[in-house]
Amino acid sequence: VFENHLVLNERKDGFSQIRIINQETGNDNYLEFNDNAYTSYLSINKEMNTNILRYVFTSLTKPPSTYDYNMDTGESILLKEQEIIGGYKFEQYESIRLIGIARDGEKIPISLVYKKDLRKKGPQNLLLYAYGSYGSTIDPYFSLSRLSLLDRGFIFAIAHVRGSQIYGRRSYEEGKLLNKKNSFYDFIDAAKFLIKKQYTKKQNLFCSGGSAGGLLIGSVINIEPTLWKGAIAAVPFVDVVTTMLDPSIPLTSNEWDEWGDPRIKEYYDYMLSYSPYDLVSNKEYPNMLVTSGFFDSQVQYWEPLKWVAKLREYWTSKNRLYLKMNMDAGHGGQSGRFRRFRETALAYAFLISLTKE
């Protein structure tokens, strides 16, 4: 709130927006961003008696940048941009927002980034990522480490599935409790849409997700095991029924609003119908990398361990199944910038090794 202006962070058509309302005239306007897949949000604005608004802009191709915007003149001034060592040129990359259609007719926004001219070479290696829980929306963001993957010919894509709030509260409600499977179906349908549009093909398609996003990965490989060349599940929540039945585990009782209370038969049966651990069977599972942290208090280490053990028991393919246990890490992975880079490097090495086959 400013003396003469009211500024709102909004979401419109799936994009984060900054709306400015002149309190004297009632007129409003939105900041315009010349990008196809971006994120914008308000920075720290301590002064009320000013016409200067500070905000941050980032996208799949542009690092986080802080601007001052004059709400009277409409002029933006760049104050600071994250420095990228090594001569990064965003013009060499391209980002785009596509709209896929889910099996029930709902729209699935998909944000993609890749090196320019890559699309001229036909279907490429593509890593599809999603989260899709708790109403958390993964907006398009810049990643320094991701450049390593893009420079090796990968396309990176974010499927904005239900369970997030990409289109507001309705998107969240349609991806939780007894609607949870919509998150998984959206992800699969987004993947098939990208194949249809020839961004990739089955032999080049990889998927990734962590925590509740790891649940998504565990579910989609049960539903469509042969759709993926490889899958990465980081600290995955995969034994849904057992965990939600044990209130002694941290967060369990608080999570009933998200997944349901399995002490109620309707919720128990529904959870059992998608819980990755309970649905493991003799299938041609893709190549897999599963990671966990020994000190993880949110998804205890034994949950991914027992899942991998059961997968190995039912494993029928010649594909690889790796488990990486971080003995000094928690739910967020290794602390420290360089140790975190090692985790990313491991995931990328797994993906790249599969492209050599």
Whereabouts are the PLM-identified features?
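Non-catalytic accessory segments flanking enzyme active sites
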Residues: V1, N9, F15-I21, T25-R119, ...
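Short hydrophobic segments within beta-strands
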Residues: N9, V56, V113, Y129-A130, ...
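Flexible loop residues that form catalytic
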Residues: R11, T58, G132, G210, ...
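Alpha-helix termination/capping residues and helix-transition junctions
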Residues: K12, E47, L60, K121, ...
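Conserved hydrophobic/aromatic pocket- or pore-lining residues that grip, position, or stack substrates
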Residues: T66, G100, I110, L128, ...
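Short substrate-entry loop that stabilizes the transition state in hydrolases
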Residues: L118-G168, Q300-Y301
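Active-site-proximal cap/loop segments of hydrolase catalytic domains
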Residues: I158-E357
